[in-house]
Amino acid sequence: MSKPNQTLGEFIIENQSDFPGSSGELSRLINSLRLAAKVVNHEVNKAGLVDIIGAYGETNVQGEDQQKLDVYANNKFIQTLTNREIVCGIASEENDDFIQIEGHKGDHQNKYVVLMDPLDGSSNIDVNVSVGTIFSIYQRVTPVGTPVQKEDFLQPGNKQVAAGYIIYGTSTMLVYTTGHGVNGFTLNPALGSWYLSHPDMKFPEEGQIYSINEGNYIHFPQGVKDYIKYCQQEEGNRPYTSRYIGSMVSDIHRNMIKGGIFMYPKSSKASEGKLRLLYECNPFAFITEQAGGKASDGFQRIMDIDPTELHQRVPFFCGSKKMVEKAEEFMANAKANPQSQEFSFSSK
């Protein structure tokens, strides 16, 4: 039961009963993530005053130019989790391979692994657009006491223990789930504490916002083009409006509050999709489903996909349940009728 002015620490302690036999390890892990987020938030807020914006001069494993804040955030989250000896391994979008972590005694007694995108949307930081951190937590599948292995990270999203994101915007929020609903906490910068501000967050079943980079329209699959036309068509007084920030955390956060769909399909420029299954799609799929929404690759549930590599990419559709289902309907019809250039938009 949420309480007025409840802090994140109080909330975590109160809800440990959701996990019978819990040792408190997951609680300490989430506490460590909130600490790292506060440190990163401090740097994001003064980015225009110090030499921490702009390109770092290197590319990550994705072939993307690393921003200085990408590197800073990645280092801070890894350092915080490593120093507290509460995880056995970390995989980051910014690193080629996973990181094995052992305790100060040289042992491997911890049972959780963390996968993360330390700073999503960082290319927008120069123009003062909100950015965010995305994280996902799993229990390892290899024996405790042994070094973590790749298979500990290559688990389907339905095995997640917890997932969340931090949005660094006009206010800083941490939103997360442990499989018992979604709750949002806002940082009070004067006190340095996170307070429960958005209890039991839910996607409206139907929404009015569709979020997609329409500049890539010509490269999209026919089903996606058809769905966009459906949203734009005036016939039937459809209430849809396009809103796209270009920061995944910001777009999905808004859509969860207002109601809408976020889409990043495959395209002729990115045949497998662009977003990472493990670092971006799985955590947001878990959050979305716990908030009453839906997440898929256009044809199947995201969290049922068995990953084959750490940096695997997939198409991604998530948001209000009815909007995602309608997009899937257009995708299915385009696949079943490949010769047809347009689907009938008369359906309600």
Swiss-Prot record:
Source domain of life: Bacteria
Cite the cofactor comment.
Binds 2 magnesium ions per subunit.
Pfam (any one): FBPase_C
Tell me what reaction this enzyme catalyses: beta-D-fructose 1,6-bisphosphate + H2O = beta-D-fructose 6-phosphate + phosphate
Needed cofactors, names only, are:
Mg(2+)
Q: Which UniProt keywords apply?
A: Carbohydrate metabolism, Cytoplasm, Hydrolase, Magnesium, Metal-binding
Keyword set includes Metal-binding:
yes
Q: Name one GO cellular component term.
A: cytosol
For this protein, the record's CDD domains field holds: FBPase
Task: Drop me one GO molecular function for this one.
Answer: fructose 1,6-bisphosphate 1-phosphatase activity
Q: Which SUPFAM superfamilies match?
A: Carbohydrate phosphatase (SSF56655)
Binding residues for Mg(2+) 2, per the UniProt record? D117, D120, E280
Q: Which InterPro entries match?
A: FBPase_C_dom, FBPase_class-1, FBPase_N, FBPtase
Where, in this chain's numbering, is Mg(2+) 1 bound? E93, D117, L119
**GO terms of biological process kind:** fructose 1,6-bisphosphate metabolic process; fructose 6-phosphate metabolic process; fructose metabolic process; gluconeogenesis; sucrose biosynthetic process
User: Which residues bind substrate per the record?
Assistant: D120, G121, S122, S123, N213, Y244, K274
Its family? Belongs to the FBPase class 1 family.
Write down the HAMAP family for this protein, in alphabetical order.
FBPase_class1
Under the subunit heading, UniProt states: Homotetramer.
Instruction: Report the protein name in the record.
Output: Fructose-1,6-bisphosphatase class 1 2
Q: Which organism is it from?
A: Christiangramia forsetii (strain DSM 17595 / CGMCC 1.15422 / KT0803) (Gramella forsetii)
Record gene name: fbp2
